[in-house]
Amino acid sequence: MKVSYHGHSVVKIEANGKVILIDPFLTGNPKTDLKTEDVKVDAILLSHGHGDHVGDTVELAKKNNAVVVAPFELATFLSWQGVNTHPMHIGGSHEFDFGKVKFTQAFHGSSYIDEENKTITYTGMPAGILFTAEEKTVYHAGDTALFSDMKLIGELNKVDLAFLPIGDNFTMGPEDAVLAAKWINAKTVVPMHYNTFPVIEQDPYQFVEKLQNCTGKVLEAGESITL
């Protein structure tokens, strides 16, 4: 399994001959190296409905005939836009031809914000994502605060690689993320959701230096880890 980071919370996984994208915020993302027109994808996994995570999902899904796996309300909302979706909910898992997906808790919001019409559409509960393929498990925490049930994620799963938000303000900051890493007990931890905007500026190298009992790795956009 090859896992690459593409800025903000964008993660690409190549496994079982398939390409999976998590939270494909490409257009308007100053930290990504990916261009929508160049992306080939078989499946898109979404943690929640905010624009900096749904991003280019509709365009990518339609262009590639990709399935979008998302929390139920968000999946329904996207299906109304002509997207092929597979709805799930927190605690549920499903075996796809590209791998197994399980949604975990995340403490955050989830909505579609229409700035022009000044409306906010509820898109269900936010989620974290456990993805398992080729006997390896990746945990993408989505946007979340620290919460004690992260201990359960670590107890019930053998996490090989975890992506944790460290930006603070909208998610947990570096100090809380250090504790999250301890509870999740992943072999390797990569920081995400930082330095995209001024309000979430952080030093990822200081974060990884504080990690205990795991390997911390800062990935620049386009860099990858092979599991």
From Swiss-Prot:
A Pfam family reported for this protein in Swiss-Prot or TrEMBL: Lactamase_B_2
InterPro entries: Metallo-B-lactamas, RibonucZ/Hydroxyglut_hydro, UPF0173, UPF0173_UPF0282_UlaG_hydrolase
MF terms (GO), sorted A to Z: hydrolase activity
Family statement drawn from the similarity comment of this UniProt entry: Belongs to the UPF0173 family.
Name of the protein in its database record: UPF0173 metal-dependent hydrolase BC_4613
Provenance organism: Bacillus cereus (strain ATCC 14579 / DSM 31 / CCUG 7414 / JCM 2152 / NBRC 15305 / NCIMB 9373 / NCTC 2599 / NRRL B-3711)
Keyword terms, alphabetized: Hydrolase
Keyword match Translocase: no
Disulfide bonds: none
